Curated annotation (Swiss-Prot):
Residues 1-33 are annotated as: Disordered. The active site is at residue 106. There is a cross-link at residues 105-226 (Tryptophyl-tyrosyl-methioninium (Trp-Tyr) (with M-252)). Its EC number is 1.11.1.21. This is Catalase-peroxidase. It catalyses: H2O2 + AH2 = A + 2 H2O; 2 H2O2 = O2 + 2 H2O. Bifunctional enzyme with both catalase and broad-spectrum peroxidase activity. It comes from Salmonella choleraesuis (strain SC-B67). Binds 1 heme b (iron(II)-protoporphyrin IX) group per dimer. The gene is katG.
Length: 726
């Protein structure tokens, strides 16, 4: 019988053919565009974390809410929670100290300095994939233990801040003196889509350290925070783990001393859990049944909790006082001889063969066991460089305490950006180089000063292209992930930024602006650089027949070279900046994907990216002065010509060579080459979503809207690092 007959029979009996079971017809189900075209451009990355997903609304002010928080009472509640053991997840030795330290560590430990993504700044541990990573087993329980406290204090404390504060309080409760705590992490309400966790399709796929150097991700295996605790690819070899440890900790900006301090400090308290084989462990939170209510890894072994708990599969307790701070980690590491053994779950670990039974059992006070260590713990003894640091910490516990306090603070605050973003009563006074410190303001330019400065810039002989280009070069280093970079500080005038190929315009323009700054002495160089962009855009808009005042907020300062970590700032150098038609390497993704990546780092929406590219092309801001994408006969005029000519069917585009990176636009009738373009230009005509946006600005009635939209997006970029205005 035909499908038509089936449908007819269904209708004749009064039944709806769409309610008869079979295929999933719910929203979002079925074969999607990316199933057909897996390399489809991810324009959707520019739409994440919008107000549509935020239940608190766009008027919510976290800093204002936090100011209402009884901070002391909150810390008191956290301290009480540490020893309030719950039967559904009993605390080891009656304390959740180790669990909460691990929760905070694993929240912050996803940060990587190469692109500033990951980290604890958004509370992403609540969402997939992190909530279900193999390395985060049982942290769902830690978050549930915190829920009554989050419920009590509501929006006065974000989940993101609470996770880290809980780790700090756990350390303090163990007798350790922390370096401080800065709040200010605002929650988001959906998973980050922009973080590249790697290409692997299976959990715990091994990555060689050399591969990590080429693609500096945060871990040596998919689903781990750092390294495999059993050694690379379960090798069980402490020495072979050294390269992996350096690679992963180095990728988040940690040196050898910080690395040793963090590993030892983190393993001074608590334990690992491996009561039985992983086959007893159920589905992770994302795959668990609906009745599990977001909890995962249910264990069928014994009670499944307490002494029967299975987390990593390792069963290690490092110190004699696992709920109190000590130097026992280093004492045990060097005092005893270690032999390889296996946990009850079969995982490779080491036991102190010549040690007495001095380690307390977490649930039976009458029992003791020998000290145990992870494979990667022993790396700190057998790697020559790590060993020197470890012995120093063994002999100088105060040096260890100081190193761990600072390294822990760095670990948990590295992705927060400048100190200006920190709030709360425990923010340390000391400025740290990794915070990209800035001096106090020297200038407070008046409105009259600004008017005079604009006139001086306009009379300086700089072109519109030069003025706009230098402002973009200064501001566009900003990264939304870790809030680094931006125009404040005028680091464009310092090493390493002044020497970047993409910033070639700085060599021509900065001497002019620096001379002007010294002559007038009314504003910082940082403000003058941004003001130059204002002058250039206002001139370009006027040339297009639109009178507009570009908003400008003074108050930027000029950083010193000694306040600038050259190595860390080198990571901000773009491998591509499609807004300036710049690309340094052809072996990393596609040009158009890198444009999306750059726009996402600048927190731009797809319309904002579109209008900025179109405007910057007609203003002639290509890094090398090329004519690629300059689809206009009147450069320097803020017109919609880029869009109108890109979408004009009079022109046919063809690649100039097999690389498919450069293209010529020829007149279909004459064959004459009219324009040249890169992939960062043509994508606005080829991608269906971006073409739809380009069509808006190509319409005959779009000119004034285009100028206003361009100015709004431009000002947004210029002020991305103005946390004093937010």
């Amino acid at each position: 019988m035909s499908t038509t007959d089936d449908t007819h029979n269904t209708l004749s009996t009064g039944k709806c053919p769409f309610h008869q079971g079979g295929h999933d017809r719910s929203a979002g189900a079925g074969t999607a565009s990316r199933d057909w075209w897996p390399n489809q451009l991810r324009v959707d990355l520019l739409n994440q974390h919008s107000n549509r997903s935020n239940p608190l609304g766009e008027d919510f002010d976290y800093r204002k809410e936090f100011s209402k928080l009884d901070y002391s009472a909150l810390k008191g509640d956290l301290k009480a929670l540490l020893t309030d053991s719950q039967p559904w997840w009993p605390a080891d030795w009656g304390s959740y100290v180790g669990l909460f330290i691990r929760m905070a560590w694993h929240g912050a430990g996803t940060y990587r300095s190469i692109d500033g993504r990951g980290g604890a700044g958004r509370g992403q541990q609540r969402f997939a994939p992190l909530n279900s990573w193999p390395d985060n087993v049982s942290l769902d329980k830690a978050r549930r233990l915190l829920w009554p406290i989050k419920q009590k204090y509501g929006q006065k404390i974000s989940w993101a801040d609470l996770f880290i504060l809980a780790g700090n309080v756990a350390l303090e409760n163990s007798g350790f003196r922390t370096f401080g705590f800065g709040a200010g992490r605002e929650d988001v309400w959906e998973p980050d889509l922009d973080v590249n966790w790697g290409d692997e399709k299976a959990w715990l796929t091994h990555r060689h350290p050399e591969a990590l150097a080429k693609a500096p991700l945060g871990a040596t295996e998919m689903g781990l925070i750092y390294v495999n605790p059993e050694g690379p690819d379960h090798s069980g070899e402490p020495l072979s783990a050294a390269a992996a440890i350096r690679a992963t900790f180095g990728n988040m900006g940690m040196n050898d001393e910080e690395t040793v301090a963090l590993i030892a400090g983190g393993h001074t308290l608590g334990k690992t859990h491996g009561a039985a084989a992983a086959s007893h462990v159920g589905a992770d939170p994302e795959a668990a049944p609906i009745e599990a209510q977001g909890l995962g890894w249910a264990s069928s072994y014994g009670s499944g909790v307490g002494a029967d708990a299975i987390t990593s599969g390792l069963e290690v307790v490092w110190t004699q006082t696992p709920t109190q701070w000590s130097n026992y980690f280093f004492e045990n590491l060097f005092k005893y001889e270690w032999v390889q053994t296996r946990s009850p779950a079969g995982a490779i670990q080491f036991e102190a063969v010549d040690a007495p039974d001095i380690i307390p059992d977490p649930f039976d006070p009458s029992k003791k066991r020998k000290p145990t260590m992870l494979v990667t713990d022993l790396t700190l003894r057998f790697d020559p460089e790590f060993e020197k640091i470890s012995r120093r910490f063994l002999n100088d516990p105060q040096a260890f305490n100081e190193a761990f306090a600072r390294a822990w603070f760095k670990l948990t605050h590295r992705d927060m950006g400048p100190k200006a973003r920190y709030i709360g009563p425990e923010v340390p006074k000391e400025d740290l180089i990794w915070q990209d410190p800035l001096p106090q303001p020297l200038y407070q330019p008046t409105q009259e000063d600004i008017i005079n400065l604009k006139a001086a810039i306009a009379a300086s002989g700089l072109s519109i292209s030069e003025m706009v280009s230098v402002a973009w070069a200064s501001a566009s280093t900003f990264r939304g992930g870790d809030k680094r970079g931006g125009a404040n500080g005028a680091r464009l005038a310092l090493a390493p930024q002044r020497d970047w190929e993409v910033n070639a315009v700085a060599a021509r323009v900065l001497p002019v602006l620096e001379a002007l700054q010294k002559t007038t002495n009314k504003a910082s160089l940082a403000d003058i650089i941004v003001l130059a962009g204002v002058v250039g855009i206002e001139q370009a808009a006027a040339a297009a027949g639109v009178s507009i005042s570009v908003p400008f907020a003074p108050g930027r300062v000029d950083a010193r070279q000694d306040q600038t970590d050259i190595e860390m700032f080198s990571l901000l150098e773009p491998i591509a900046d499609g807004f300036r038609n710049y690309r340094a390497r052809l072996d990393v993704s596609t040009t158009e994907s890198l444009l999306i990546d750059k726009a996402q780092q600048l927190t731009l929406t797809a319309p904002e990216m579109t209008v900025l590219v179109g405007g910057m092309r007609v203003l002639g801001t290509n890094f090398d002065g090329s004519q690629n994408g300059v689809f206009t006969d009147r450069p320097g005029v803020l017109s919609t010509d880029f869009f109108a000519n890109l979408l004009d069917m009079r022109y046919e585009w063809k690649p100039t060579d097999e690389s498919n990176e450069l293209f010529e636009g020829r007149d279909r009738l004459t064959g004459e080459v009219k324009y040249t373009a890169t992939r960062a230009d043509l994508v606005f005509g080829s991608n269906s979503v971006l073409r739809a946006l380009a069509e808006v600005y190509a319409c005959s009635d779009a000119h004034e809207k285009f100028v206003k939209d361009f100015v709004a997006a431009w000002v947004k970029v210029m002020n991305l690092d103005r946390f004093d205005l937010q």
